[in-house]
């Protein structure tokens, strides 16, 4: 018997939504014979996670965007992709997450099916946009470090903006089929309107492969080649001919590598569950514990607030710009002033953006 999809048992959405939205497949992991009553501590925990994620996501990613806008040292071709990633993270914090929080408070979905569709659409747009932006960052780093002679031509200001436009065009194209297949549904286990893995096994496998596994393999390839080149230069080249590896540049590269690793860790469990369920829905779905399904989703949700924190912890330029922005909030007229124009700032700090145009290794290899 299919579990009730809208809200708590017996709950129905307001409005006249498509009947496809009102059903959940028997194969949905954890669906069982209905939605079981949730203990109050679980709802409180999920609500706390969402509140923290929303606040840190909005504040942190706005700081990232404003930092790049205010500081000329951070306005470079590589950081265009960082801003793209920040925008992708902001998408979920301003609409889908607040609606999920409202569902937790109300113990069910209380809005129309249109809000559900829009929430699920923005959720997918954010996820795929994040994946493609992280892939764009990795390719940018690979070209900058391993093919430095051609980097300036490949990543001119105009070209970089075109790449970001391509990223979001592909993201939009990738998410539109969800509206046609009917995979954007409300799931009471996670209090969210999101991609439903059990609607179509073939489509779920295609989504996981092309929207997660393939992009992550591209990122892994890029970073492995970068690490190989860095290690080769550091350990196998004679000291006399060894190019200088600037510590600050290396930390900048590590920052983006950490962003990728955390994204992969947070999203891998959910994608793995999707593949397992899609491989044999009838037998595998009932074996997925509900707590694991819920935990994998909220781990993925939590990732949207991590990137801005990583930049602040690992990158001095962003950390200092964060501090300036927070202080300048008290002086409105100074808020949108280019902070890199201050004489004292130019004296105290050397240029060292998160993704700089100067390279770790001045060789054109790999």
Swiss-Prot record:
Glycans are attached at residues 16, 23. Disulfide bonds join 116-193. Its main location: membrane. Changing residue 282 to D: In Mel 1a(beta). It is found in: Cell membrane. It is a multi-pass membrane protein. GO terms for molecular function: hormone binding; melatonin receptor activity. High affinity receptor for melatonin. Likely to mediate the reproductive and circadian actions of melatonin. The activity of this receptor is mediated by pertussis toxin sensitive G proteins that inhibit adenylate cyclase activity. Possibly involved in sleep induction, by melatonin activation of the potassium channel KCNMA1/BK and the dissociation of G-beta and G-gamma subunits, thereby decreasing synaptic transmission. This is Melatonin receptor type 1A. It comes from Ovis aries (Sheep). The lineage of its organism: Eukaryota, Metazoa, Chordata, Craniata, Vertebrata.
